[in-house]
Amino acid sequence: MRKKVIAGNWKMNKVLSEAGEFMNSVVPKAPKGNDVEAIVCAPFPFLSKLVEQAKGSEVKVAAQNMHFEDSGAFTGEVSPVMLKDLGVTHVVLGHSERRELFAETNELVNKKTKAAFAHDLTPIVCVGETLDQREANETMNIVGEQVKQAVAGLTNEQVAETIIAYEPVWAIGTGKTATSEQANEVCTEIRKVVAEVTSADVAEKVIIQYGGSVKPANVDELLAQSDIDGALVGGASLDPESFLQLVEAGTK
């Protein structure tokens, strides 16, 4: 039985005081136990404070991106070594906004995924198709290729620990949501692709999230699907009560 993983991706939102208030609201009320994992994916300047506030709780703190090198002349970048030193446990990689706005490629996402494992960080690897690709019936090919390239060169054990987030680009921040059946169909395909490049046993262990306009009103239906093990949530994760409702849904 795979546990549910609910990750809130704040993107470029909040200031430090607001981030602290959020954690003050969430940490004491977050469900305890092994049924669900709550992860807050925050901007770099907040990570140290949030890790401190989450100490002693089961709330995890993630970065939204990182460089693949440990150090060097990469002005403006943050390394996996820095994140690990802060106490961060997870890192979001290859989000569609990074791919589209910052030209991140499958090859780059793979380098970052390997770097995450080299420093004992759990990668949340994002994959997903655009509206044009979906309408051209390219969804499975596009997403399958993104998955294959992201996990290329990883050990089976590392693949089993990778969290894959399926985020159809056309459903992010648009208010449009893939139906639970559409979402599950792609998540099932992702598991099949993982099985092809590793084994059925490994594929059964991989946690696959859905992301794209997830909110308390639709999360139950999404999490009830056979191959959806959690959610990567944007806007609805910015409010502590909304985020707690989403996490609570993972315990059902």
From Swiss-Prot:
Pathway where this protein functions: Carbohydrate biosynthesis; gluconeogenesis; Carbohydrate degradation; glycolysis; D-glyceraldehyde 3-phosphate from glycerone phosphate: step 1/1
Binding, substrate: 9-11, 173, 213, 234-235
GO MF assignments: triose-phosphate isomerase activity
A GO cellular component annotation in the UniProt record: cytosol
Catalyzed reaction equations: D-glyceraldehyde 3-phosphate = dihydroxyacetone phosphate
Sites bearing Phosphoserine, chain numbering: 213
Cellular localization per UniProt: Cytoplasm
CDD domains per record: TIM (cd00311)
GO biological process, one term: gluconeogenesis
InterPro entries: Aldolase_TIM (IPR013785), TIM_sf (IPR035990), TrioseP_Isoase_bac/euk (IPR022896), Triosephosphate_isomerase (IPR000652), Triosephosphate_isomerase_AS (IPR020861)
Membrane spanning residue stretches: none
Annotated keywords: Cytoplasm, Gluconeogenesis, Glycolysis, Isomerase, Phosphoprotein
Location, primary (coarse class): cytoplasm
Gene3D superfamilies linked: Aldolase class I
Function: Involved in the gluconeogenesis. Catalyzes stereospecifically the conversion of dihydroxyacetone phosphate (DHAP) to D-glyceraldehyde-3-phosphate (G3P).
Family: Belongs to the triosephosphate isomerase family.
Subunit field text: Homodimer.
Protein name: Triosephosphate isomerase
Species annotation: Oceanobacillus iheyensis (strain DSM 14371 / CIP 107618 / JCM 11309 / KCTC 3954 / HTE831)
Taxonomic placement: Bacteria, Bacillati, Bacillota, Bacilli, Bacillales
